[in-house]
Design a protein with these regions (language model features):
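Soluble non-cytosolic domains of exported or imported proteins
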Residues: 20-27, 42-53, 171-178, 230, ...
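Glycine-rich, acidic and aromatic/proline-enriched surface loops and short helix-turn segments
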Residues: 23-35, 147-156, 294-296, 306-314
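Extracellular/luminal Protease-associated
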Residues: 102-223, 322-326, 330, 334
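N-terminal capping segment at the start of a domain
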Residues: 22-46, 50, 62, 66-67, ...
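C-terminal motif of bacterial Sec signal peptides marking the signal peptidase cleavage site
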Residues: 15-16
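Sec-dependent signal peptide recognition
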Residues: 2-9
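Noncatalytic luminal/extracellular "stalk/propeptide" segments of secretory-pathway proteins
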Residues: 39-163, 267-269, 286
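Soluble metallo-hydrolase cores and metallopeptidase-like ectodomains found primarily
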Residues: 92-94, 106-142, 223-327
Length: 336
């Protein structure tokens, strides 16, 4: 690119595949990064270090310039690991705690970077898609949910409506779980439970189960993320169907109600959540890897091309193969 600077952020390796030779190089990078040698590429592990060095070495071979004396840019991370055996997730219906199994029926934790989080008797409220999108004239939060636990659908209404609302089947940011947790926190919710459904999520429950159990890494925040909801989690479609049946309705009926701009959040009468979470915190340092090609005409302008290099590492509790190799997520993006 002649007129602007092109920047490659680590999250990545970029070579392009404009020829058969480039395609072979791309495939080689994918195979290498997703091999057992890289141990699942988890930050703060030997496999993560090997991954960063691999990317930096390749940037050097391409002749990319660096920001400073290294392609490595430090990032401080905090890992939060839920002690499941010491933690409590009590979902009750009319005073009776229902049987819910961690990982099989629910995954949960906290984004707050603290050793313990507790709340009791938080009323459940179904908030449709959990979306507040003024540009689409859409607001699922027309009631006060402060201190309550909001239950919501994955994706955004466009996935089902397929019309002009949102972007049809293509997910907007409003459909992502990251947004849903952020918006629930802005609304003051104590807890957030996303209902998993494979088609609108675009991945099966196993992805949620594996991704949300074990250590959860985030940037280290001075305020310890205390502005986030106390509990963030997912429940299976089967659990949601049972809860809605207790309300005398069905999942499909509730979803149909949520597909209207006039939707009003629905209290899930008699249903409450109490939780006590015990966490182990681990602070570690990792790096982004960044290099750039300076433009000849406007060298102070940049085009960013990014991909995350990390994956889920190794799970020693698993039987058999314990390495999450992460070819699709995200060796393919890193090698692109």
């Amino acid at each position: 690119m002649k007129n602007i600077a092109l920047i490659f952020i680590s999250l990545l390796i970029i070579t392009g595949c404009s020829s058969e030779s480039d395609l072979e190089k791309y495939k080689e990078h994918v195979i290498t990064l997703s091999s057992d040698e890289f141990e699942g590429r988890a930050p703060g592990t030997p496999g993560g270090v090997k991954t960063k060095n691999y990317i930096a070495d390749h940037f050097g071979s391409l002749g990319l310039e660096s920001f400073g004396d290294s392609y490595l840019m430090p990032v401080n991370l905090t890992g939060v690991t839920l002690d499941v055996d010491q933690s409590i997730f009590d979902l009750s219906v009319n005073g009776e705690i229902i049987d819910i199994v961690y990982r099989t029926d629910v995954v949960y934790g906290t984004t707050r970077q603290v050793e313990s989080v507790n709340f009791t008797d938080s009323d459940l409220v179904f908030v449709g898609y959990g979306v507040n999108a003024p540009e689409y004239g859409w607001n699922d939060y027309k009631v006060d949910v402060k201190g309550k636990t909001v239950v919501m659908l994955i994706n955004d209404p466009g996935f089902e409506l397929r019309g002009t609302d949102f972007k049809g089947k293509a997910m907007t940011y409003y459909g992502r779980w990251t947004y849903k947790f952020e918006e629930a926190a802005r609304q003051g919710a104590a807890g957030v439970l996303i209902i998993h459904e494979t088609a609108p999520a675009s991945y099966p429950w196993g992805v949620v189960e594996n991704g949300w159990s074990g250590e959860q890494l985030n940037l280290t925040f001075a305020e310890k993320n205390l502005d986030r909801s106390a509990l963030e989690g997912w429940i299976t479609l089967d659990v949601a169907e049972k809860l809605f049946a207790e309300m005398g309705t069905t999942y499909e009926e509730m979803k149909a109600k949520a597909l209207s701009k006039d939707f009003q959040a629905i209290p899930m009468e008699g249903m409450k959540l109490s939780s006590s979470m015990v966490n182990t915190l681990k602070v570690s340092d990792s790096h982004n890897v960044a290099g750039y090609v300076k433009g000849s005409e406007t060298p102070d302008e940049y085009v960013l091309i990014m991909a995350h290099w990390d994956h889920m590492g190794v799970d020693p509790t698993r039987d058999g193969d314990q390495i999450y190799n992460g070819a699709v997520d995200n060796a393919t993006g890193t090698a692109a």
